[in-house]
Amino acid sequence: MGQEQGTPWIQSTGHISTQKEEDGQKIPKLEHRNSTQLMGHYQKTMNQVAMPKQIVY
């Protein structure tokens, strides 16, 4: 019984760790793109909030 309970746990953990490694390799690229887009979006939003009179036509 102990081995039967242990084996699926080991397999599932190995599967999860494999997914984490794959995600870890992809995350830096996504973070870099998102941070660049977020900064651009953040600056636009800040400009709208900081200078509403200039944006109102």
Curated annotation (Swiss-Prot):
Biased composition, class Basic and acidic residues, residue ranges: 18-34
Compartments reported by the entry: Host nucleus; Host cytoplasm, Host cytosol
Biased composition (Polar residues): 1-17
Keywords from the named record: Host cytoplasm, Host nucleus
GO CC terms in record: host cell cytosol; host cell nucleus; membrane
Residue segments, region Disordered: 1-35
GO biological process, one term: symbiont-mediated suppression of host cytoplasmic pattern recognition receptor signaling pathway via inhibition of MAVS activity
TM region(s), chain numbering: none
Family annotation (InterPro entries): Flu_proapoptotic_PB1-F2
Highest taxon of the lineage: Viruses
Function according to Swiss-Prot or TrEMBL: May play an important role in promoting lung pathology in both primary viral infection and secondary bacterial infection.
Note: Is not encoded in all strains, and seems to be dispensable for replication.
UniProt cross-references to HAMAP family, sorted A to Z: INFV_PB1F2 (MF_04064)
Protein name from the UniProt record: Protein PB1-F2
Species this chain originates from: Influenza A virus (strain A/China:Nanchang/11/1996 H1N1)
Designated gene of the protein: PB1
